[in-house]
């Protein structure tokens, strides 16, 4: 294995992130049956907020509260309380993706392993502990704590500084979102691997080093490279 460091995104790269199920579970505590239509309405608000967050236009707190503002008004609850309940629900239901544990075992001892995530601090540590994967990772970099999000090159520069400034030609970034994980890795001068499990069309102007459809495929690839 030619890599000194392999960095992963977290959500939908190493861990499942079924936000619909998490929201359904969370809203049960408020006697609300959260429907597919409700989820569509939620995503219509949530997705643009994530784009704004990744572009540095809003803070993590504005994102976390903004996505629940309409529900907070309906339920007469603080949006921060709904957000906290959602994160707790997600921590309970998140599991490693198929092939994640096998892949981490294959890498461990051959390269150092890190996470660079745009997710939020409250979820990351709890999820790593609950899934039993905490000890696999040498470094955990969370955008909320750094103050910038992928694809901003600064979060990658920060991660590499924390990693001891390894040779960037010997660092690989793996993620499922081309517009943040892969573009950011490219901007930082890293090799990249796009986990494209849903066979999305490759965005124009973003050219990953490799593209795989599963973590099993990535493990096989790393055995050769």
UniProtKB/Swiss-Prot annotation:
GO terms for biological process: pyrimidine nucleobase salvage; pyrimidine ribonucleotide catabolic process; response to xenobiotic stimulus; thymine metabolic process. One of its GO terms (molecular function) is nucleotide binding. GO terms for cellular component: cytoplasm. Divalent metal cation. Highest activity with Mn(2+) followed by Mg(2+) and Co(2+). In contrast to nucleotidases from other families, is not inhibited by ribo- and deoxyribonucleoside di- and triphosphates. It is found in: Cytoplasm. It holds the Pfam family Hydrolase. This is Pyrimidine 5'-nucleotidase YjjG. It comes from Escherichia coli (strain K12). The lineage of its organism: Bacteria, Pseudomonadati, Pseudomonadota, Gammaproteobacteria, Enterobacterales. The gene is yjjG.
